[in-house]
Regions:
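Short intrinsically disordered terminal tails
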Residues: 1-2, 13, 17, 61, ...
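Acidic, low-complexity, intrinsically disordered interaction modules
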Residues: 22-88
Length: 96
């Protein structure tokens, strides 16, 4: 079974290899059962972003494409999909 924290760490490592720093704040599931993550690209904004999140304001990362992923499935495609989404949010395309 894949732990979502393992996915988070793999995403951070993969993006760092590509020169993109991202800082995760939290994962949550909304009332409709859709999973999201909240993150910021600016390390100095972690505290402020965390406060926004605590007040139920999404900071930079609402991502709901995990609805078809189950914890016992391999997570390679999920890591790749999250990385691709983050890169697109900062205007970088994966040309690999």
């Amino acid at each position: 079974m894949t732990d979502i924290n393992v996915v988070k760490e793999r995403v951070i490592e993969e993006l760092k290899k590509q020169g993109i720093d991202v800082y995760f704040i939290d994962f949550y599931v909304d009332d409709g059962g859709e999973p999201y993550f909240v993150y910021t690209f600016d390390e100095l904004m972690i505290e402020e972003a965390t406060e926004y999140y605590k007040n139920n304001w999404i900071v930079e990362g609402a991502f709901d494409d995990w609805s078809f992923w189950y914890a016992d499935e391999p997570d390679d495609w999920l890591v790749a999909d999250i990385c691709d989404t983050i890169k697109h949010r900062i205007g970088r395309n994966n040309n690999a």
